[in-house]
């Protein structure tokens, strides 16, 4: 777990594939930190952000551990600015889906926070519409 966390401190090193692999197969405590470290590694540009986001999107959807899904949502929000279309739109749609449908309230809250922090007018409008329709409070 400490290794997965500390790898995020070296985003220029060749750490992307080991972090992706950890997020796929390791224990929950390691996956949790691998998600956060992938955000740091991916923030160095689109070439690293895109594969990091691809794995984070998968983990957001299928990981059995709520804390890993929550960290994946946070990490996707952090990577958003480094991504290009259509990946940015996929991140928004996945976070919206998670915010509305995840069975854990903490994961839903983290997805909403990630969306709000994107500071994208069209995303904020969608959130406001969901509030007005009574789907969000």
Segments predicted by a language model, with ranges:
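Residue-level recognition of hydrophobic positions within alpha-helical transmembrane segments
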Residues: 98, 105-106
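Short, mixed-charge aromatic SLiMs
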Residues: 31, 100-101
């Amino acid at each position: 777990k400490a290794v997965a966390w500390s790898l995020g401190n070296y985003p220029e090193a060749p750490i992307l594939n080991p972090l992706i692999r950890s997020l796929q197969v390791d224990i929950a405590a390691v996956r949790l930190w691998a998600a956060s470290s992938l955000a740091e590694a991916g923030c160095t540009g689109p070439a690293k952000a895109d594969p990091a986001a691809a794995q984070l999107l998968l983990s957001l959807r299928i990981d059995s551990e709520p804390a890993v899904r929550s960290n994946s949502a946070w990490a996707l929000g952090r990577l958003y600015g480094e991504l290009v279309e259509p990946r940015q739109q996929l991140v928004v749609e996945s976070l919206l889906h998670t915010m509305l449908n995840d069975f854990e309230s903490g994961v839903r809250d983290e997805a909403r926070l990630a969306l709000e922090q994107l500071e994208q007018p069209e995303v904020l409008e969608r959130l406001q519409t969901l509030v007005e329709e009574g789907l969000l409070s």
